Amino acid sequence: MKDRENKSLPLVVELSPALDAVTVFQKLSALPHVLFLDSALKDDHLGRYSFVAADPFAYFTAPADGSDALSQLAPQMAKFVSETVPDLPPFQGGAAGLLSYDLGRSLERVPRPRYDEFELPALAIGLYDVVLAFDHVSGSGYLFSQGWPETDPALRAERAARRANQFLRQLDSFGNRHGPPAGAVDFARRTCRGSHGNYLLNKGG
């Protein structure tokens, strides 16, 4: 793996051609809040890039109760802004995660569902200081390390180097081992929270 010359942050490391997005995701899967944005369609315009991120320095969730979740997140995002290195994959660190369908209740007045079967948050967003990005056209992969949440230039550069090395060691040491398999699901077990009659009533049956 070779360092790409940079005079400023983010720190950029070009990855070995042997590492693709799926392999990197598998190797980092045990880290907290691992995220895989996979472009399954390898297309110059619609599916050029894939991204893997993990172990965010901050993580936010908000309940799907109609509260203004986005405005609560915006001030945190504004603290961590960086110039994008040109001619490389565009997501080089920052906010990424889940925006659920129920986030719409933060934007307009719509009735709440009678039952919340899955109890998903309105949003679950990580602030990622390390992102691994893959360009499917050029066949290149890169590690971006921003050094956040440090804001002092010297401390930020120090953290960026330390975090880059941490991830590179993780990629080198774990081989092709995966995390523990998920437990089996008993599909025969009933999981409905309401009665059958209420279910039919809710569905208009």
Language-model features, listed with the residues they occupy:
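Extended accessory regions or peripheral subdomains of proteins
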Residues: 1-34, 39-67, 101, 105-205
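Donor-binding/catalytic cores of nucleotide-activated saccharide
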Residues: 61-96, 102-108
